[in-house]
Amino acid sequence: MSLVYLLIAILVIMAMILLMSKRRALAKYAGYIALVAPVISSIYFLIQIPSVAKLQYLSTSIPWIKTLDINLDLRLDGLSLMFSLIISLIGIAVFFYATQYLSSRKDNLPRFYFYLTLFMFSMIGIVLSDNTILMYIFWELTSVSSFLLISYWYNNGDSQFGAIQSFMITVFGGLALLVGFIMLYIMTGTNNITEILGQADHIKNHGLFIPMIFMFLLGAFTKSAQFPFHIWLPRAMAAPTPVSAYLHSATMVKAGIFLLLRFTPLLGLSNMYVYIVTFVGLITMLFGSITALKQWDLKGILAYSTISQLGMIMAMVGIGGGYAQHQQDAIASIYVFVLFGALFHLMNHAIFKCALFMGVGILDHEAGSRDIRILSGMRQLFPKMNLVMTIAALSMAGVPFLNGFLSKEMFLDALTQTGQLSQFSLISMIAIVFVGVIASVFTFTYALYMVKEVFWTKYDSKVFTKKNIHEPWLFSLPSLILMVLVPVIFFVPNIFGKGIIVLALRAVSGGNHQIDQLAPHVSQWHGFNIPLLLTIIIILLGSVLAIKVDWKKVFTGKIRQISVSKSYEMVYRHFEKFATKRFKRVMQDRLNQYIIMTLGIFMIIIGYGYIRIGLPKVHQLHVSEFGALEIILAIVTVTIGISLIFIRQRLTMVILNGVIGFVVTLFFIAMKAPDLALTQLVVETITTILFIVSFSRLPNVPRSNANKKREIIKISVSLLMALIVVSLIFITQQTDGLSSISDFYLKADKLTGGKNIVNAILGDFRALDTLFEGLVLIITGLGIYTLLNYQDRRGQDERE
């Protein structure tokens, strides 16, 4: 089955979900219909593993906009396969979990599952895209669907603010990424990603190479919540927990990492890229791990822990990026080891973090709180979640016999080997190891502290008063399955390592198939070495800090108020107030004022152009022949126009304005343009009648006395606008050096297959204009239909 058919199948499921929104009886089954999408995609991608392992990559290319090299290019290699499996398999767990989390009585289920399926469709589109512009479209679709999901409970102020904040930051990064893609097109002449990576040696010597890297980093850092763009992720926790488990831990936040991995053969050619990604990742890891200890909300803790873990993966992606420069060197195996560790921990993090979010969601759903100051001794009430969250948290902390231990060991090993790499000095290595170890200590601390406070403290019935707590099996099933995978991966890591991660490494290395020999064999025991010593130190220090320190009392007062997010909110509120004041000053419900402002800005732009190039010179002016009729019509038009300034009765003004329109109709007839005359006549008649009918239903309020200052402004704007129009006519008559667009239409008319030049212009040459005009009519019709339908429902409700 083609990759396109898979995407079409997901779109069909989305359409079915939308249809269910019309039938309340069917709406409650929307989740199970939506569940088909990740199941189908999971089966599809699992079947493709043997083919990808044999280097039989699946690709599809459908021409779209050939002149701009924008095509529907899709490609399934090892990297896209790994990410697609994570998106699809985690999707099954999350979609099923959501069917138990949401209520068909309180929630609009079709709307939620449509948004969630749209997000899954967009993420799969990102990882399969082999065209930069296509990737950008899917990239922004994830931002849009994330916005819709975060704001799903739109009556909640936190949901609204979180959705807006995440949308603004991620779209800003997306626009920067688009600029980077355009730079790549300028440098290579193609938008095809495979072809771009094949020109890496040419691109690195181009003047736009470094600016392009910065654009890519902005896109990746904003999407993957790297410092200082991390602030949107904690606010996004206002979304329903299934959204947090899927988007904000396992998939969307990994899109930035995917971007850098996909372009590693190109970006890694710059040492600057290696430095920036490595140190930004480590700073983010340290910042996230410390800030997590400040949180009282369990989802807040997990949000900052996600930021920290993403920083850890990003640091490994940065260090491993140097492989692009040293593929044939003896140290190539170190880079491959680091990249393998990044991919391994990316997979591990998706599993244990999704399980943690699901556990928090069950606690919130059943206990009614996520506050660790209220939740205590929950192991008695939630034994299954105690097991799930404890194992998942310890895996995140890097405790032995769990999958997180293996990837954390690889991370520490990678840090200690940076001294052997040409990009890092001994001092850099010491700083990297120090920051990585300190961040890991705090990671262990918040992971252990979280489960200790929620499950292993004494149950206090005075603080937690809710009764009749239960822990449904179906609700717990997805998190239990993910929990089982945590120790399973520890004992059989190479099933995933050799079967999936090595395939992804081939793509990250730029198609170097010899990387199979360089890829590490994951072992549970490497003997007593420096990474193991560091792990022991981390566990001992982290245990002491988690057990002996009451972190709820440490971050209090002014220390707690220090926050990058609060600084963003302060700036945002300031600009919001500033914009509101300006808006109220400008938008005063006066149409003539809006027209004056619009024309004024237009005149400023034209005036600036005249200042730069000089006023148009009048020479060889061609004046059309005119007779007495044209002179009379012109005098009538000018006379009526001047009289409108002094007339105070609105109805008289409307009638005279209509007369001007009819005079223009006579002008068209005199100029032998009957089609334009007929159009003008119909439009002018309808608008005049509508005006008169509207005024007949409005109170007879006389027009206010003229304000001399305002009238002078109006007359001045009108005269200046008239002069500009006349000057533009002069300019167009003197552009003899340029070919006329009308000549092009006449010569190319036969190519369209049309028999009428007007039809050819509307249907071919100006097809987009016609399309958008049609869309305007459709949207207007939908608006009218909605209003009428609303009135019908309202009347029916009143009768009932």
UniProtKB/Swiss-Prot annotation:
Q: Which residues cross the membrane?
A: 1-21, 33-53, 78-98, 118-138, 167-187, 207-227, 241-261, 273-293, 300-320, 331-351, 387-407, 424-444, 472-492, 527-547, 595-615, 627-647, 651-671, 676-696, 712-732, 768-788
GO cellular component terms, alphabetically, are: plasma membrane
Which UniProt keywords are present, listed alphabetically?
Answer: Antiport, Cell membrane, Ion transport, Membrane, Transmembrane, Transmembrane helix, Transport
> Keyword Membrane, does the record have it?
yes
Major subcellular location class? membrane
Which domain of life, per UniProt? Answer: Bacteria
Q: Which GO terms describe its molecular function?
A: antiporter activity
**Localization terms from the record:** Cell membrane
> Which membrane topology term applies here?
Multi-pass membrane protein
Gene Ontology BP term (one):
monoatomic ion transport
- What is the purpose of this protein? Expression of the mnh2 operon in E.coli is not able to catalyze Na(+)Li(+)/H(+) antiport. It does however confer higher growth rates than the control strain at up to pH 9.5. The operon may encode an NADH-ubiquinone oxidoreductase.
Sequence similarity: Belongs to the CPA3 antiporters (TC 2.A.63) subunit A family.
Record's subunit section: May form a heterooligomeric complex that consists of seven subunits: mnhA2, mnhB2, mnhC2, mnhD2, mnhE2, mnhF2 and mnhG2.
Protein name, as recorded: Putative antiporter subunit mnhA2
Q: Which organism is it from?
A: Staphylococcus aureus
